[in-house]
Amino acid sequence: HLHEIVCSFLLDAKYGDQLGQFCAVMPIDLETAISPSRERNGEPKKLAQLEFERQGDHVTASVTRQGVTIIEVIGDVTGALAVPAPFPVLQFWYKFLPAVSGEGFDAGPFLVTLHQTMKPETCERVDGKLVLRDLPGTPVADLPVLQLEGARLMMTSSEFFHVLEDVEIDPDQYARHVRVQYT
């Protein structure tokens, strides 16, 4: 079994009356996990180099895709925080099969929800900065960061399951977003 390192870039989202998060991009370092995850669950995984380093209280983390460091965190641990109780996370993913013709879909799109219980083990406050850089097809820098409210370094474990939701997704409305998931 190979171990994958994954980063999730999540945006607050709502579907119907369900509050959750939309995973805009999921950089991963294990190429063989990309296609099966997309095809089975709709996970927006993209190959990237992920790095995390801690030297004493100084931490750095980065996500590099196609030679561009698109996400970078630089900071210092300033103290321990109370370890939160386990908490639920709901993520929205879209699963689809692009059409052979190049126009529209042969199947889907479908809404898949990830129901996850995060179980924090440690939690520390980090003071630092977040840098987002532009890369076509990975639009993290297109999102305005008005203020960094805080950063935490948390070690967690989790339990999760996926649900294929019984809802209709308008294929014409979703088609314009397909390029982002595959580039």
What positions do the PLM features span?
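Aromatic- and glycine-enriched beta-alpha-beta binding-site module
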Residues: H1-T78
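Interaction-surface and assembly-scaffold signal
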Residues: L47-T183
